[in-house]
């Protein structure tokens, strides 16, 4: 991100250590603690490559245009399909939902007008860059009568939010890619302890994403 670069530069000039949690800066001296957003998208692509039938059609709900993590998640998804040799999968539409549930519902409502006929969807999956948009997609499809049975259309999100995990457990979402907030907090604390002790922390500490599906969701439910 360019937006936080000036603040990092100011801190660097005063000799103040900087930790970037979740978002990398494009310049400056800092320790990054977080997850690789590319990996989240790649996990979504891996799931779809394995579970979608030949010739499947997909709708993609991206995050916010111009944000690197949005681009990384999309790229990871696309690369996973390519690596799996799934050139038969068609991306019917790709639109920015800004990570907002209501915006995702609005977009999905419009997609349904275009890609559903006679009460039947002409698409097999909706891949979303976060859980809120995935939940919006679920509500939109339910409202249109296209998701009367769980799992009719594969819907995946990112975050591993409580609502996302519940939707996976109920079968309305096939996957959420968990962003391990607790793991990131623990890693950040460890960096702070090193700084307090006069040690030099690693420049980058990656906390892996985790793919959550019906097969392992029970391990994550509270």
Regions found by a protein language model. Give the residues of each.
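Pocket-flanking alpha-helical
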Residues: 2-9, 100-117, 132-143, 161-169
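Hinge/beta->alpha junction and helix N-cap segments in small-molecule ligand-binding domains
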Residues: 1, 23, 32-43, 60-82, ...
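Short helix-capping segments at alpha-helix termini
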Residues: 11-16, 81-89, 117-120, 142-151
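Venus flytrap/periplasmic-binding-protein-like
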Residues: 19-22, 128-131, 135-173, 212-213
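Hinge/cleft segment of the Venus flytrap/periplasmic-binding protein
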Residues: 69, 80-84, 180-222
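Flexible loop/hinge segments that line or gate small-molecule binding clefts
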Residues: 2-39, 43, 50, 57, ...
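Local beta-strand N-terminus motif with an aromatic residue
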Residues: 121-123, 173
